[in-house]
């Protein structure tokens, strides 16, 4: 009898006597790559936009940003996938991890913006006043006083954003496409766990 393959070999779909169907290592690697790239862009962008909205709520540009944030937050993920396909996949002439991360980033930003804005708004006004009284300008007070005080709420928003996009399938079907190989190239098609789940559902023999 053939030895039973270890969980590690089964996950990587390495041959052990007979080819082992399945394997999700390519999906795990792809998920980490795309999620990492999306987080690197979405977190600072979301925090900056949230801080801007919290401090300039009556500004016309801030009102436009707020409207755009609400619009993106309510947009179905499949529509974001189609838009990213037009904006990124078509100009790049191919599916890629970059396109997938752009779609995930677009979905993450509104959640981070709103969590940052709402957390900053509920901070005691005395924090900002004390910082300004000590001679700090608005930007310095925001960076050194308000944002550290709002860390808990902002971090919660980041976790919610990551939790939302990590299970998305529709936008990645239009952007990352999927790949059966463990791939680290960001300019090539790449797999993700939700895409693998969809593939396994459609073809149980995989």
List each language-model region with its residue ranges:
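Intracellular coupling helices
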Residues: 114-132, 140-147
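Interhelical loop and adjacent transmembrane-helix boundary motif
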Residues: 3, 13-16, 22, 172-206
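Transmembrane-helix boundary motif in ABC transporter permease subunits
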Residues: 38-69, 82
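Alpha-helical membrane-interface segments at transmembrane helix boundaries
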Residues: 21-37, 62-73, 85, 89, ...
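Alpha-helical membrane-protein architecture signal
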Residues: 21, 25, 29, 61-65, ...
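Glycine/proline-centered hinge or cleavage motifs at structural transition points of membrane proteins
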Residues: 76, 134-135, 148
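Transmembrane alpha-helices
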Residues: 39, 138-175
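Generic hydrophobic transmembrane alpha-helix motif, especially the helices
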Residues: 70-105
């Amino acid at each position: 009898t053939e030895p039973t393959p270890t969980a590690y070999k089964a996950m990587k779909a390495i041959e052990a006597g007979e080819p082992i169907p399945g394997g999700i290592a390519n999906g795990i690697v792809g998920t980490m790559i795309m999620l990492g790239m999306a987080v690197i862009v979405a977190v600072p962008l979301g925090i900056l936009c949230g801080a801007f909205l919290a401090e300039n709520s009556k500004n016309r540009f801030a009102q436009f940003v707020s409207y755009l944030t609400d619009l993106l937050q309510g947009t179905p993920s499949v529509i974001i996938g189609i838009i990213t396909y037009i904006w990124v996949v078509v100009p790049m002439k191919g599916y890629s991890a970059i396109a997938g991360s752009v779609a995930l980033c677009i979905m993450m930003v509104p959640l981070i913006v709103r969590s940052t804005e709402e957390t900053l708004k509920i901070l005691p006004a005395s924090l900002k006043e004390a910082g300004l009284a000590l001679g700090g300008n608005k930007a310095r007070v925001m960076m050194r006083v308000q944002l550290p005080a709002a860390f808990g709420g902002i971090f919660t928003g980041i976790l919610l954003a990551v939790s939302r996009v990590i299970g998305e399938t529709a936008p990645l079907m239009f952007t990352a496409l999927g790949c059966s190989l463990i791939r680290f190239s960001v300019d090539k098609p790449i797999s993700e766990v939700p895409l693998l789940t969809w593939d396994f559902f459609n073809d149980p023999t995989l």
